[in-house]
Amino acid sequence: SFAESHAIPLYAVAVSSGPGSYTGLRIGLSTAKGVAYARNVPLIAVPTLQLITVGPLLYDDDMPDDALLVPMIDARRMEVYAAVYDRALHTVREVGADIVTADTYREWLDRAPVYFMGDGAEKCKAVIDHPNARFVDNVHPLARHMAPLAERAFLEGRFVDLAYFEPFYLKE
């Protein structure tokens, strides 16, 4: 293999675990499981919504310490899959399917600056008019942004069962 012929050590395989496209998650997970199994290394599942936050966290030097991050994936109509995290990526609110209205995120907007990002954030721009609302454009889950999340999971020993792990679809 390329990795073996170039003496590149492989200690684990990381994969985006969802939510997201059913087909995309299945293909990605099948590939990751195959590589992890063939190389006899552990599998790391990285939540897609956390993955979306990495770019803004790495490149926005002006983001205040008390900022909250709301990564979003467009579901359909006015629905998004979203979670709320603090800057350390601690979960403030678990992943859920939200109908976007002017009040959907008011609880957090009234407390701190809230950064909306991901392909679902465009829906919020049209309906949320709050001084703490910040919209980060053109943010997508990128493989290169998976590295810091996967490294943290690796160091903490957070691996998933290679045989039985399933993607998180949120909705079947």
Model-inferred region functions:
Residues A12-S16, G24, L68-M72:
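Short glycine-aspartate micro-motif
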Residues R134-E172:
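Acyltransferase
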Residues S16-T48:
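DPxDG-like acidic metal-binding loop motif
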Residues F2-H6, A38, P56, M146-F154:
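Stable alpha-helical structural segments in soluble proteins, enriched in small hydrophobic residues
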Residues P42-P141, Y169:
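Surface "functional belts" at beta-alpha junctions
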Residues I27-T31, T101, L142-M146:
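Catalytic-loop motifs flanking and including active-site residues across diverse enzymes
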Residues S1-P19:
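N-terminal beta-alpha supersecondary unit
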